Amino acid sequence: MSKTNSETGNNFEQQKQELIAALKACGAVRYGDFTLASGKKSKYYIDIKKASTDPKTLKIIARQAALRIKEMDVDTVAGVELGGVPLATAVSLETELPLLIVRKSVKDYGTKSRFVGDLKPEDRLVMLEDVTTSGGSVRDAIEVVREAGASLKYVITVVDREEGAGEKLKEADVELVPLVSASDLLK
């Protein structure tokens, strides 16, 4: 028997609360004065890198992202170095989909590639991101993947700070899928 929309919605709400509790318990939510990657100042910081080093929290993230991926037409899980790599790796293990790591720049040694893993033009990727603010950090990775001929229509972020990333990604025909929003996390 399939679940109704209200059952699915309740399930996502329970999952969100489970993730919020895990993020707080592992110390990933901090208060103080911080400068974000976007250059913005903030009174709070969400340290998903800390969360990704906690096996219980990482497992919750991977499981919840995998459930979202079941609804998507994708065949590869991608993550941008550094923060996206443990997330994408855990999700790849959970979904058994291939992993692609997107480097921030080309290395001047070895394969001299922006990618670790196989990327084919027919691939349909979902990108994992730790925290989204303006969406600028992930936009470069999306463009590099698309320049290689692959398709990328979804970015799953653990936490969306709700500061424009969804709108910016929509302009690039990418749907932002947050596991939790900052407003929910900071309640």
UniProtKB/Swiss-Prot annotation:
<dbReference type="GO" id="GO:0004588">
    <property type="term" value="F:orotate phosphoribosyltransferase activity"/>
</dbReference>
<dbReference type="GO" id="GO:0019856">
    <property type="term" value="P:pyrimidine nucleobase biosynthetic process"/>
</dbReference>
<feature type="binding site">
    <location>
        <position position="103"/>
    </location>
    <ligand>
        <name>5-phospho-alpha-D-ribose 1-diphosphate</name>
    </ligand>
</feature>
<keyword id="KW-0665">Pyrimidine biosynthesis</keyword>
<feature type="binding site">
    <location>
        <position position="133"/>
    </location>
    <ligand>
        <name>orotate</name>
    </ligand>
</feature>
<dbReference type="InterPro" id="IPR029057">
    <property type="entry name" value="PRTase-like"/>
</dbReference>
<comment type="subunit">
    <text>Homodimer.</text>
</comment>
<comment type="function">
    <text>Catalyzes the transfer of a ribosyl phosphate group from 5-phosphoribose 1-diphosphate to orotate, leading to the formation of orotidine monophosphate (OMP).</text>
</comment>
<dbReference type="InterPro" id="IPR004467">
    <property type="entry name" value="Or_phspho_trans_dom"/>
</dbReference>
<keyword id="KW-0808">Transferase</keyword>
<dbReference type="GO" id="GO:0044205">
    <property type="term" value="P:'de novo' UMP biosynthetic process"/>
</dbReference>
<keyword id="KW-0328">Glycosyltransferase</keyword>
<comment type="pathway">
    <text>Pyrimidine metabolism; UMP biosynthesis via de novo pathway; UMP from orotate: step 1/2.</text>
</comment>
<dbReference type="Pfam" id="PF00156">
    <property type="entry name" value="Pribosyltran"/>
</dbReference>
<protein>
    <recommendedName>
        <fullName>Orotate phosphoribosyltransferase</fullName>
        <ecNumber>2.4.2.10</ecNumber>
    </recommendedName>
</protein>
<dbReference type="GO" id="GO:0000287">
    <property type="term" value="F:magnesium ion binding"/>
</dbReference>
<dbReference type="InterPro" id="IPR023031">
    <property type="entry name" value="OPRT"/>
</dbReference>
<feature type="binding site">
    <location>
        <position position="107"/>
    </location>
    <ligand>
        <name>5-phospho-alpha-D-ribose 1-diphosphate</name>
    </ligand>
</feature>
<comment type="similarity">
    <text>Belongs to the purine/pyrimidine phosphoribosyltransferase family. PyrE subfamily.</text>
</comment>
<feature type="binding site" description="in other chain">
    <location>
        <position position="104"/>
    </location>
    <ligand>
        <name>5-phospho-alpha-D-ribose 1-diphosphate</name>
    </ligand>
</feature>
<feature type="binding site">
    <location>
        <position position="161"/>
    </location>
    <ligand>
        <name>orotate</name>
    </ligand>
</feature>
<feature type="binding site" description="in other chain">
    <location>
        <begin position="129"/>
        <end position="137"/>
    </location>
    <ligand>
        <name>5-phospho-alpha-D-ribose 1-diphosphate</name>
    </ligand>
</feature>
<dbReference type="InterPro" id="IPR000836">
    <property type="entry name" value="PRibTrfase_dom"/>
</dbReference>
<keyword id="KW-0460">Magnesium</keyword>
